[in-house]
Amino acid sequence: MNTNVFRLLLLGSLFSLSACVQQSEVRQMKHSVSTLNQEMTQLNQETVKITQQNRLNAKSSSGVYLLPGAKTPARLESQIGTLRMSLVNITPDADGTTLTLRIQGESNDPLPAFSGTVEYGQIQGTIDNFQEINVQNQLINAPASVLAPSDVDIPLQLKGISVDQLGFVRVHDIQPVMQ
């Protein structure tokens, strides 16, 4: 009889352990699905922003639009050559938003010293019928690069606009500067 009781206890323990293992696997699966849903939502939002950025740039006759949520560069044909531009390190601060404008030359030559204009603000309406509101601008200057291909990071302080309000950054009038 002792062996039957022992077998019964062992069998009960195995059922309990198997139930725990299954619950653990179910919890892990739920966590994986939740993480995947969050990643898909973020990917969908980035895709929408990339599409919007591409449409704005297709319609733009002057400069290049960069949308904070796009997280992808855009090309600008300028007086100093073809440039790839992107926004990185976008963070809130007490006066608005700080970010870095990354400019990369696409040729094998170093970039000359240059200046340009950065406009930023909000976009109201649809991409097909939009209006830029609360637009502010600032001039940028970059020294000549020594190395090629050239990357220039320009820190920007966008005063008076929070990260959530920032709808666009537009860079235009890139011109060489004589030193």
Segments predicted by a language model, with ranges:
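Sec-dependent bacterial lipoprotein signal peptides
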Residues: 1-20
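Contiguous hydrophobic segments
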Residues: 2-5, 32-51, 155-179
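Solvent-exposed, flexible loop/coil residues
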Residues: 5, 70, 115
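Short, solvent-exposed coil/turn linker segments
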Residues: 16, 22, 162-165
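Membrane engagement elements in two modes
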Residues: 20-88, 92-98
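Membrane-proximal structural modules of membrane-associated proteins and complexes
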Residues: 73-179
